[in-house]
């Protein structure tokens, strides 16, 4: 089980990562990683970076059956 400090340190080493990548790297369940990232965000230590829909090549993200699954969410330290 990873700690909040390990999540912070991993973000410091890698720059920015997705929650799934952090979960896999630290061998910790993703819901736990999501909670830790939200805690870091509320403490002002981490920031959530969401891709803009402008990057969609087909321009049809709004009507995508996967519900914007192509838009990735990254985390980085402030």
Swiss-Prot record:
Single Gene Ontology MF annotation: 4 iron, 4 sulfur cluster binding
Entry-linked SUPFAM superfamilies: Winged helix' DNA-binding domain (SSF46785)
Induction, per UniProt: Up-regulated by S-nitrosoglutathione under anaerobic conditions. Repressed by the global regulator Fur.
Keywords tagged on the record: DNA-binding, Iron, Iron-sulfur, Metal-binding, Repressor, Transcription, Transcription regulation
GO biological process: one example: iron import into cell
Disulfide bond entries: none
Family matches, as Gene3D superfamilies: Winged helix-like DNA-binding domain superfamily/Winged helix DNA-binding domain
Pfam family, one: FeoC
TM region(s), chain numbering: none
Binding site for iron-sulfur cluster: 56, 61, 64, 70
Job of this protein: May function as a transcriptional regulator that controls feoABC expression.
HAMAP family the UniProt entry points to: FeoC
Family statement drawn from the similarity comment of this UniProt entry: Belongs to the FeoC family.
Name of the protein: Probable [Fe-S]-dependent transcriptional repressor FeoC
Gene: feoC
């Amino acid at each position: 089980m990873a700690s909040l400090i390990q999540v912070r340190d991993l973000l410091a080493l890698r720059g920015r990562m997705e929650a799934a990548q952090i979960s896999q790297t630290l061998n910790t369940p993703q819901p736990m990683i999501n909670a830790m990232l939200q805690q870091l965000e509320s403490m002002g230590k981490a920031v959530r970076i969401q891709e803009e829909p402008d990057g969609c090549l087909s321009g049809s993200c709004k009507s995508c059956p996967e519900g914007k699954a192509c838009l990735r969410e990254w985390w980085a330290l402030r």
